[in-house]
Amino acid sequence: MKRKIIVGSRRSKLALTQSNWVINKLKENYPEFDFEIKEIVTKGDRILDVTLSKVGGKGLFVSEVEQALSDEAIDFAVHSMKDVPSSLKEGLIIGAIPKRESPLDCFVFNQVNSLDELPQGSVIGTSSLRRAAQLLKHRPDFVIKPIRGNIDTRLQKLHAENFDAIILAKAGLARMGWLENTTLKLEDIPPEVCLPAVGQGALAIECRESDQQIRDMLTSIHHEETGICVEAERVFLKKLNGGCEIPIAGFATRANEFVQFKGLVGNADGSIILESEQVGANPSEIGNKVAEDLLSEGADTIIKELRNV
């Protein structure tokens, strides 16, 4: 009799699309298993009338899923890596990180077709302090207005609430199949304008450390280069004790065995943005070094002030 593998997922269309993508990849290698998705509602899904930075805490989109893993109600979980706290619940590990989608943020415009065409005082929809701070540094005239909900909800609000543009993760649009043959007015935001969130574009497949069968299975869809880059980013995040209440960004690439990593911390209005970039062979060392650079420049003061607001 086939073992049935229970996969934990949030119930948004994007989360279910991501979970089904992982399942289909695993079925290619393990056709002898059956897979079933268990939908789980998280705190972040329930609280939609408050920005995430004001809700506070870590793991807003993963805590309930991790609890189901610990309780053995599910066998593994599929998360967006950028939602996963830098420290996992005891007994749980990241079993695999598949190949990364685009890490970039992108504009979805209401009327115009590019950032340069947005008029003075344009209203931009984002609830991300990271995106808001970097965008305000680039265009202090912008008015940032919070927007919550899943991708389809936010796309509806673009027109219904008269935003000039909203910002979404390009990876989500790609996974939903909305980049091809789309009527959406899209433009990638280069990292020089808006450095991505730690882990953005990557998936995290979390499992119990003690479940060797699942761990062996997940190894088949792990992408080494993505895993190395994400390691540098998450070490950086952990060193700074970052969360969604801090404008913090980090993005690593790898070429010729070397990791290039850039990290950033800023204040809420983008008037202070601290940046550092390092290159090296060891992703953990590089992530730590960039964090230490920013701390020496005063990142700890910014973080303390934001947490006391």
UniProtKB/Swiss-Prot annotation:
Name of the gene this protein is made from: hemC
Family: Belongs to the HMBS family.
Keywords per UniProt: Porphyrin biosynthesis, Transferase
Other notes: The porphobilinogen subunits are added to the dipyrromethane group.
EC supergroup of this enzyme: transferase
Protein task: Tetrapolymerization of the monopyrrole PBG into the hydroxymethylbilane pre-uroporphyrinogen in several discrete steps.
Residue ranges the record marks as coiled coil: none
An annotated GO cellular component: cytoplasm
Name of the protein: Porphobilinogen deaminase
Keyword Secreted included in the entry's annotation: no
